[in-house]
């Protein structure tokens, strides 16, 4: 590939830096530059191109804000109608339906550009009422990160940056970005100890802020959740009465309130969703005929709304007749499927006890460690039904929240689940192995001269902004592949799904955005040479690449792009808007378009959002010592991210009900950021000072102690379920206050697919307020017995607007 005029100065800069750093002609260092010689990344320009990238990214951010304001004013119904429609579908959303007009009133009170001022005027109490506890914990986590970065920004800019500028290893050019990095200090400079000390301080600061955040996480444990056990490993032919009799005989002091077996209802869920859509469409055209006195003809083919003439195969038919026929067919299929489901138990059960202490006692009996000779786990208390129920094979845990359970995924278990998991993740590995990082994608594009016309312009504005924009775009695309692969794994709870997503997306992002580009592995040919060619002199570890003068500028530009372009795109929710547009185009009729509007609201994906934010936070912390100028831009990113998330949580997404473990998982991964900073500093000391230098030994000791502490914490976290103390519970004041109340059994259990209770004879109300949510079977038939249906004052207006 012919080198472009823009890249001609690169070799001379490489020679200059090698001489100044005293690295000589070592192949590792030349590799770092050669790998980027014909690439659009890691370019050496004035101050790393940061001023240019900052100006263009801010301009793009303002443009995205303008576009969002227009879309919100003209097309915001695609989000609002869905939120109003979802409001009355489930008990946990009834706080929305009770004040669904309050959101509109709140915006009207704010005057001009209400969504922008709402970000600053929203109180946590409003967000708690509207979005739930998980949103509060998520925003609290962001606030702790903000305060942490404020402190680190002050220390990095007021202490570390002046120390780096005091060196003269890279000259006195005020436009040189390298002067702000640790590479500007001489190896015999005692001020290098300051960096080591501050890296330890940053570690303790992070631990302190995260500990404070963890203490603030308080969940209102719903008594029904702590009273219910989830049991797997039951024989599929086990009956409800047999399970109840076993607990009555084995644990005479524990009273069973209810036992619910689980069935394979994935297909039933799909059929019921289609039926509700059909019934709504039928009601839409029935009301339209009553209003106009004319019957409506439709073309029931995909994109049929765009057919303006009748040809063979695209004939029009009466809308009421079409949807009546579809509804009758679906009702027949639902009836047949319902009777078939009763013969397909899954070998799982939810068992609810009268008191929490009873469930705790039984859980301790099944899961507590009982070392008896060579047996680590003893048998639970037996009964006359133990052999029939195969009690020794049971796995018993506390049940998750009813809203957290993905009922349709319960049928995927055992070998089938593991084979599906292995297949999905193997395919993911194969795809991502060849597209490991955005840098590799971009360097591969360079091989085909994709970016050659950009270089031919010899315009530093375009040549610096274009790579940064591409880097962010691919950084947003590749995690989406990981995200959707996690959804395909069919986890049984949303909490488990989000928890896996946090770890999976975070680890992948760290490798593709931070570690591999930092080591200079930015093209496929060099990546494979490093991976497989053990005879080449260029295959040793490229730790020198981490500390090249322009390396930090590459990540500063990435953080700037994430702050402005990333936040603007999250506010715009472009993927959701594209999906909405596609579904509206594919809709067959006006009634189908109305259904699309009512099904456009989604729950907030805390797992993916945690992972994305923690990736950028880790990049910031990893370079906070070696490249201190990155920290204030990281603070800007977290501030913008916090404001955008406050808006989206309140105005754009449905509330989610998750377990608190996902928030603790995010805290654990946040603690990895300062540890990576210590690793970076140790590599620098090892390369520049040698292994026997006091600063290197001290950093190495701190790294070892930190790793040891992490291992002990992880092992304790993994094995604490073996301890009976893990199940010790404390009664709340309300529990202690009324003994009589504690003995009142719950009127019903939500751990049951409501579809199975008289679905064939049930007729769903067809108003927009009766729209189902996502996955929980009880949602399909509306509210539970004994629960009032909250009336939505804005429902009529929304319905009228949809029909217009």
Swiss-Prot record:
Record-level Gene Ontology MF annotations: calcium-activated cation channel activity; mechanosensitive monoatomic ion channel activity; nucleic acid binding; osmolarity-sensing monoatomic cation channel activity
Membrane topology reported for the UniProt record: Multi-pass membrane protein
Gene Ontology terms: cellular component: centriolar satellite; early endosome membrane; lysosomal membrane; plasma membrane
Extracellular side: 1-51, 167-190, 444-461, 532-553, 624-627, 689-693
Gene: Tmem63a
Annotated region described as Intracellular linker IL2, given as residue ranges: 218-413
Disulfide bond sites: none
Glycosylated residues (UniProt): 38, 449
Cytoplasmic topological intervals: 75-133, 217-415, 490-494, 586-605, 651-660, 709-804
Compartment(s) where it occurs, according to its Swiss-Prot or TrEMBL record: Lysosome membrane; Early endosome membrane; Cell membrane
Source organism superkingdom: Eukaryota
Knocked-out gene: effects: Mice are all viable from the neonatal to late adult stages. Double knockout of Tmem63a and Tmem63b results in lethality at birth due to impaired alveolar expansion and respiratory failure.
Membrane-crossing segments per the record: 52-74, 134-166, 191-216, 416-443, 462-489, 495-531, 554-585, 606-623, 628-650, 661-688, 694-708
Quaternary structure and interacting proteins, as annotated: Monomer.
Protein's recorded name: Mechanosensitive cation channel TMEM63A
InterPro entries in UniProt: Csc1-like, CSC1/OSCA1-like_7TM, CSC1/OSCA1-like_cyt, Csc1/OSCA1-like_N, Nucleotide-bd_a/b_plait_sf, RBD_domain_sf
Residue span of region Gating helix: 554-585
Family recorded in the similarity comment: Belongs to the CSC1 (TC 1.A.17) family.
A Pfam family reported for this protein in Swiss-Prot or TrEMBL: RSN1_7TM
Catalytic activity field: Ca(2+)(in) = Ca(2+)(out)
Function: Mechanosensitive cation channel with low conductance and high activation threshold. In contrast to TMEM63B, does not show phospholipid scramblase activity. Acts as a regulator of lysosomal morphology by mediating lysosomal mechanosensitivity. Important for the baby's first breath and respiration throughout life. Upon lung inflation conducts cation currents in alveolar type 1 and 2 cells triggering lamellar body exocytosis and surfactant secretion into airspace. Also acts as an osmosensitive cation channel preferentially activated by hypotonic stress.
Keywords associated with the record: Calcium, Cell membrane, Endosome, Glycoprotein, Ion channel, Ion transport, Lysosome, Membrane, Phosphoprotein, Transmembrane, Transmembrane helix, Transport
Effect of substituting residue 476 to K: Does not convert the channel into a phospholipid scramblase
Sequence positions bearing Phosphoserine: 738
